[in-house]
C-alpha cells in the first residue's frame, strides 16, 4: 500500500530516491552507520518514512548504495581506459590510469560527504566494506598491477609489482587525503583543472622513471646470478 503513497509517477519516484540517497550520505557521514536512523534520513530527505524500505529494502542496503553511488558515477565519468586503443602501450595505459584516478578524487561534483563516509568506514568498518573493496577497489588495484607488471617485465617479482602499484596509488590519493595539511605547508598548491593536469604529468613521469630504473636494476641482478 505504501507504494501508492510514495510513488506518484516515475519522475517523482526518481527524485525521491535521489533525495533519500543524498540525505543518507549526509546523515551517515555525520553520525556513522550505527548511530544514523532511517527516520533521520527520511526527515532530511523530506520523504515518507517508508521510502527507504521501498527503494532500498533496509538501512544496510541503503548504506551500501550510498557507498557505491560515487565510485560508480566516477567510473563512468572518468574511465580508467578512456581513449585507449587496443594496442596502447603500457606507458600510455599508466598515464590514462593516473589521469582517471586523480580526476576521480578531485571531481568538483563529488559530494563532500563521500570522503567522510569512507574515512569512517576505515575506522569503524561495517559488512559493506568487504563488498566495496571487492567490487570497486580490487579491480582498480588489479588493473594498475597489470600495467606495472608490463613495465617491469614478465619475470617481475610479485612483491615488486605490489610495492610499485601501491606507491603509484599512494601518490595519487595523497594529494586529496592530505589536502588540509598541504594547504598549510604549501599554500601555493592548487587543484584547478590545469593544476591536476600537471599532477598527472608529474606522477606519470616520476613513476615511469622509477619503474624503468627498477626494471634495469632487477635485470642486472639477474644477469649477475651465477
Where are these regions (language model features)?
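Hydrophobic alpha-helical connector segments
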Residues: 79-114, 161-168
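Short hydrophobic clusters on alpha-helical segments that form packing/core surfaces
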Residues: 20-28, 168, 207
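N-terminal intrinsically disordered/low-complexity leader segments
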Residues: 1-15, 216-226
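An amphipathic alpha-helix adjacent to DNA-recognition modules
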Residues: 17-22, 55-83, 130-134
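Amphipathic alpha-helical segments used for helix-helix packing
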Residues: 109-131, 179-185
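Amphipathic alpha-helical packing segments from all-alpha helical-bundle domains
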Residues: 92, 126-152, 201-205
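Helix-turn-helix
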Residues: 19, 27-61, 65, 69
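Hydrophobic alpha-helical bundle segments that form small-molecule/ligand-binding pockets
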Residues: 138-162, 185, 189, 211-218
Amino acid at each position: 500500500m505504501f507504494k501508492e503513497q510514495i510513488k506518484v509517477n516515475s519522475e517523482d519516484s526518481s527524485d525521491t530516491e535521489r533525495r533519500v540517497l543524498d540525505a543518507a550520505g549526509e546523515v551517515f557521514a555525520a553520525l556513522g552507520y550505527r548511530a544514523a536512523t532511517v527516520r533521520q534520513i527520511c526527515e532530511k530527505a523530506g520523504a515518507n518514512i517508508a521510502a527507504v524500505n521501498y527503494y532500498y529494502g533496509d538501512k544496510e542496503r541503503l548504506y551500501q548504495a550510498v557507498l557505491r553511488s560515487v565510485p560508480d558515477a566516477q567510473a563512468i565519468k572518468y574511465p580508467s581506459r578512456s581513449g585507449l586503443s587496443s594496442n596502447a602501450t603500457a606507458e600510455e595505459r599508466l598515464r590514462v590510469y593516473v589521469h582517471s584516478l586523480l580526476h576521480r578524487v578531485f571531481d568538483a561534483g563529488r559530494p563532500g560527504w563521500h570522503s567522510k563516509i569512507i574515512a569512517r568506514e576505515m575506522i569503524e568498518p561495517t559488512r559493506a566494506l568487504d563488498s566495496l573493496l571487492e567490487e570497486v577497489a580490487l579491480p582498480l588495484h588489479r588493473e594498475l598491477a597489470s600495467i606495472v607488471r608490463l613495465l617491469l617485465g614478465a619475470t617481475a617479482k610479485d612483491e615488486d609489482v605490489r610495492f610499485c602499484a601501491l606507491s603509484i596509488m599512494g601518490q595519487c590519493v595523497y594529494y586529496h587525503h592530505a589536502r588540509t595539511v598541504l594547504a598549510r605547508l604549501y599554500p601555493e598548491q592548487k587543484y584547478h583543472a590545469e593544476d591536476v593536469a600537471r599532477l598527472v604529468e608529474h606522477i606519470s613521469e616520476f613513476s615511469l622513471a622509477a619503474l624503468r630504473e627498477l626494471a634495469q636494476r632487477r635485470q642486472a641482478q639477474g644477469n649477475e646470478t651465477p
